[in-house]
Amino acid sequence: MEVVDPQQLGMFTEGELMSVGMDTFIHRIDSTEVIYQPRRKRAKLIGKYLMGDLLGEGSYGKVKEVLDSETLCRRAVKILKKKKLRRIPNGEANVKKEIQLLRRLRHKNVIQLVDVLYNEEKQKMYMVMEYCVCGMQEMLDSVPEKRFPVCQAHGYFCQLIDGLEYLHSQGIVHKDIKPGNLLLTTGGTLKISDLGVAEALHPFAADDTCRTSQGSPAFQPPEIANGLDTFSGFKVDIWSAGVTLYNITTGLYPFEGDNIYKLFENIGKGSYAIPGDCGPPLSDLLKGMLEYEPAKRFSIRQIRQHSWFRKKHPPAEAPVPIPPSPDTKDRWRSMTVVPYLEDLHGADEDEDLFDIEDDIIYTQDFTVPGQVPEEEASHNGQRRGLPKAVCMNGTEAAQLSTKSRAEGRAPNPARKACSASSKIRRLSACKQQ
């Protein structure tokens, strides 16, 4: 084909351009004929944790799935940006308080904090938690009735009371019990989460009196709706648990309003109706937990002794299953770290194939690490110290990083047969305790 000078094309009309061969290198194709290559998922490591896909996002930050490269346990990490926390009232204080509380709590029905990582340079905090497959609110939203069968609701409620009793025994008032803060594992274990607005009572406090509340409006008791200066913290949790039980068994809320002012007005009056299909035992329990006067409201001991709580409820309806993943529609909620794991395991070791967030990740503290002497050669063979940054567990980050890069360049065919977990650990520049 004859090559045409581009400067001469402006002298031709459209018809003349076609005659000189423009149609031979300008093609129009339908979008259905285009085959897009999927974007390669680059592996990203935060300390010893391999990052997966997004699980959810809230006002405080994002939650992603991660894999512990040492234990191969599935975890969830809450990623918090200090810049964003400053824009939220009491944001930083709530996060630090939640970390302090979770560090000393150990119960099967309370979410466990596994690790805390802090990135000084990017001003990011990573709260590594045990993995929960789904939230209770997500399960309720997945069915038209917006409720659980009585047998399933009873099982979840009993676990909620177990976890709540443990928190109260530790002198902690949750203040925000609701389905949105109750998570579930694949085995059906309920976990109380989000202790950001919780309050730890003084060890020598005479009672459970509280003065502040930041919980969700629909789950607040009349004493808070009416603006009382002080109130019983434990009875606030009992009320919120009662509203939660009402919601998961009926699909409704005892109090509603077009806006928060109308909602608080209705809560302050204390008038509500219980659907007739709840039955006398459940209705009596709800009335005891939603008692207007805090002094007359049920205690956890009274809830445990109630006939509806103690009764064994046979399954009359099919239980609400864990819904498919909202993004991938995966009904099994498979591990989202698998594509990243395959990338590390299947590809040659190259620095361009993975990302390490930083050479140094500070753990379990908000301060910069200490310094240790770096050896410097002298005339008599002895070495003197220069400062060298280290990880919180004493690992020399720069030395590990250099060693990792040197190993990656060394030709050794046997290394390709290593397991995925050992490869992740070798790529991680800074081991965590």
Curated annotation (Swiss-Prot):
Lipid-conjugated positions (S-farnesyl cysteine): C430
Active-site annotation: D176 (proton acceptor)
Domain annotation Protein kinase: ranges: 49-309
Summary of the tissues where the protein is detected: Ubiquitously expressed. Strongest expression in testis and fetal liver.
Classification via InterPro entries: Kinase-like_dom_sf, LKB1_c, Prot_kinase_dom, Protein_kinase_ATP_BS, Ser/Thr_kinase_AS
Protein name: Serine/threonine-protein kinase STK11
Organism: Homo sapiens (Human)
Post-translational events: Phosphorylated by ATM at Thr-363 following ionizing radiation (IR). Phosphorylation at Ser-428 by RPS6KA1 and/or some PKA is required to inhibit cell growth. Phosphorylation at Ser-428 is also required during neuronal polarization to mediate phosphorylation of BRSK1 and BRSK2. UV radiation-induced phosphorylation at Thr-363 mediates CDKN1A degradation. Acetylated. Deacetylation at Lys-48 enhances cytoplasmic localization and kinase activity in vitro.
Cofactors (names): Mg(2+); Mn(2+)
List of residues that carry Cysteine methyl ester: C430
Family designation: Belongs to the protein kinase superfamily. CAMK Ser/Thr protein kinase family. LKB1 subfamily.
Keyword Manganese recorded: yes
Enzyme nomenclature, EC number: 2.7.11.1
Gene Ontology CC entries for this record: centrosome; cilium; cytoplasm; cytosol; extracellular exosome; intracellular protein-containing complex; membrane; mitochondrion
Pfam families listed in its UniProt record: Pkinase
Disease annotated for this entry: Peutz-Jeghers syndrome: An autosomal dominant disorder characterized by melanocytic macules of the lips, multiple gastrointestinal hamartomatous polyps and an increased risk for various neoplasms, including gastrointestinal cancer. Testicular germ cell tumor: A common malignancy in males representing 95% of all testicular neoplasms. TGCTs have various pathologic subtypes including: unclassified intratubular germ cell neoplasia, seminoma (including cases with syncytiotrophoblastic cells), spermatocytic seminoma, embryonal carcinoma, yolk sac tumor, choriocarcinoma, and teratoma.
Residues at which ATP binds: L55, G56, E57, G58, S59, Y60, G61, K62, V63, K78
The keyword Membrane is annotated on this UniProt entry: yes
Known outcome of mutating P324L: In gastric carcinoma; no effect heterotrimeric complex assembly with STRADA and CAB39
Pro residues bias (residue ranges): 316-326
Residue numbers bearing the N6-acetyllysine modification: K44, K48, K96, K97, K296, K311, K416, K423, K431
Gene3D superfamilies for the chain: Phosphorylase Kinase, domain 1, Transferase(Phosphotransferase) domain 1
